[in-house]
Amino acid sequence: MSWLTKLLPPKIKREQGPQRRGNLPEGLWSKCPSCEAVLYATDLENNLQVCPKCGHHNRLNSRQRLDLLLDSEGRFEIGAEVLPVDSLKFKDSKKYPDRLMEANESTGESDSLVVLQGAIKTMPVVAAAFEFDFMGGSMGSVLGERFVRGVQAAVEQKMPFICITASGGARMQEGLFSLMQMAKTTAALTKLSAAGLPFISILTDPTMGGVSASFAFVGDVVIAEPKALIGFAGPRVIEQTVRETLPEGFQRSEFLLEKGAIDMIVDRRELRDQVARVLALLQKLPAAA
């Protein structure tokens, strides 16, 4: 028995030790994955999940992104009744319906895209946001149909359409049905363009695969969050293919801005104001307050 054990009787250790630990709720602190600063979770939440030390943008879910962008009143969801089905009876290490059920239980969403009609500083819009935590934000039949219905609503109501992307690409469990959505979504946007209505594409970390190869870059204005990973194949896959070391920051939003692939990089805390200014400019309206 050590001298410390003799000084602290077992009864005290049993009663006080666990009690002290119990007074600290879980999730009180968060560690920044970029600068490794230890942050108070409430402060991080109040800062829209942006690290106050280094500016790293942590990921948000679809509802958080839409709440950040849209006015709180007068919103309603489009396409929520469209639900996924296992047409191919696909099975890898798990059955597709089992994966859908797990994703639904963990996120509360029925698929990887949420579409809302609402307003930004009283300017009517239709906005869609990807749910990355639902099977990696993968693009399947439901996502494509909800996207198209959102665009159709924008055309019918003569509103701009906004999409916030966060996706790993096509959903392999739906095979060619998934790949079809690349053409389906892009074709729908031609009707929006023909009607003279703006499409603003907001790229967040990560925007990869079939999403980046289809509609993500066809916006009238393409905005990205800082240091977002944006591309088709991942950097490691490219390095293994070309057998060369890629430049530092390759496929990050700053690299794409330098090469002219996107129009601007906007800090999340300034996104709503910036999108409102862009909407007013594109629609020839007075600048939003």
UniProtKB/Swiss-Prot annotation:
GO cellular component: acetate CoA-transferase complex
SUPFAM superfamilies with a match to the protein in the record: ClpP/crotonase (SSF52096)
HAMAP family according to UniProt: AcetylCoA_CT_beta
Cofactor: how and how many bound: Binds 1 zinc ion per subunit.
Molecular function terms from GO: acetyl-CoA carboxylase activity; ATP binding; carboxyl- or carbamoyltransferase activity; zinc ion binding
Protein name: Acetyl-coenzyme A carboxylase carboxyl transferase subunit beta
Keyword presence, ATP-binding: yes
Subunit composition and interactions: Acetyl-CoA carboxylase is a heterohexamer composed of biotin carboxyl carrier protein (AccB), biotin carboxylase (AccC) and two subunits each of ACCase subunit alpha (AccA) and ACCase subunit beta (AccD).
Native source organism of the sequence: Dechloromonas aromatica (strain RCB)
Record-level GO BP terms: fatty acid biosynthetic process; malonyl-CoA biosynthetic process
Subcellular location, principal: cytoplasm
Enzyme category, top tier: transferase
Cellular localization per UniProt: Cytoplasm
Residue sites binding Zn(2+) per the record: C32, C35, C51, C54
Superkingdom of the source species: Bacteria
Catalysis: reaction(s): N(6)-carboxybiotinyl-L-lysyl-[protein] + acetyl-CoA = N(6)-biotinyl-L-lysyl-[protein] + malonyl-CoA
EC nos: 2.1.3.15
Pathways involved: Lipid metabolism; malonyl-CoA biosynthesis; malonyl-CoA from acetyl-CoA: step 1/1
